[in-house]
Each structure stands twice: as C-alpha cells, then as structure tokens.
C-alpha cells in the first residue's frame, strides 16, 4: 500500500493497486515517428498520442476514520421551571395642560406627574 501525499489533497490517500486490465492491455504513451517530414513539419518536435480515455491501474481510497473517539455522555437538559412572583415597577406619566384664562398666548411646558405602580407578574 503506497501513501500518496499531495499538497492539493486535504488528507492523505492510500493507493491500492487494482487489476483493471492485464499489463499487455494497458495503453501507454506512444511516440509517433515522423517518417515523411514535410517542410511545414520539420520545425515541429515529435508528437505524442495517447488513448482518449486513459484507464487507471489503481484506486485512491481515503483512510479510515479515527475510531478512538470517546463517546460524549448525554446530559438531560430539560429542567423543571418553577414560577416565581417578581414585582415589577412601571412608571405611568400623566400629562396635563393647564389652559390660561387670559387672551394672550403663553407658551409653557405642560405639567407632568409621575406615579409609581407596582404590579406582580406570574
């Protein structure tokens, strides 16, 4: 078993050779001879041809996951909720505008009165 380390793989793969075809049937790169060089082909290097669908002779199998993980104990997160009476204080604001008896328009701020009200929330 060969270990394949590649910078583009997130984790290493183990390669197991597989008998897909016999070695005589596996197509490899072949060099085509340039027997009759034409004037346009003389400057070109020797060309390579290969089968359009290459067959792989091995399979990449990811490693087994770590079996040494410890089990996380289950915790009962459902708890009974007891209702408690919590007093809340709310402010009630009464706004009263006092009209003036004279005919002149007097701009004054309205009087405000604040009462404390205590209520219980169940």
From Swiss-Prot:
Keyword list (alphabetical) reads: Glycoprotein, Milk protein, Phosphoprotein, Secreted
Would you tell me the protein name for this molecule?
Kappa-casein
Site keyed Cleavage: positions:
58-59
Please indicate which superkingdom the organism of origin belongs to: Eukaryota
**Tissue specificity of this protein:** Mammary gland specific. Secreted in milk.
Q: Which subcellular locations apply to this protein?
A: Secreted
Q: Which PANTHER family match?
A: KAPPA CASEIN, KAPPA-CASEIN
The record's function comment reads:
Kappa-casein stabilizes micelle formation, preventing casein precipitation in milk.
> Tell me, what is an example of a GO biological process annotation in this record?
protein stabilization
UniProt main location, coarse: secreted
Which residues get glycosylated?
74, 84, 86, 89, 95, 102, 118
- The region called Disordered is annotated at 98-122
Q: Which organism is it from?
A: Odocoileus virginianus virginianus (Virginia white-tailed deer)
Tell me which GO cellular component terms the UniProt record holds: extracellular space
């Amino acid at each position: 078993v060969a270990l394949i380390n590649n910078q583009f793989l997130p984790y290493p793969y183990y390669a197991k050779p597989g008998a897909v075809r016999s070695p005589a049937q596996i197509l490899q790169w072949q060099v085509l001879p340039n027997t009759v060089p034409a004037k346009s082909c003389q400057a070109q290097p020797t060309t390579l041809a290969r089968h359009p669908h290459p067959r792989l002779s091995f399979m990449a199998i990811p490693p087994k996951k770590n079996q040494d993980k410890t089990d996380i104990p289950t915790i009962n997160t459902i708890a009974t909720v007891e209702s408690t009476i919590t007093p809340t204080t709310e402010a009630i604001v009464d706004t009263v505008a006092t009209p003036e008896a004279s005919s002149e328009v007097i701009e004054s701020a309205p009087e405000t009165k604040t009462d404390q009200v205590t209520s219980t929330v169940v």
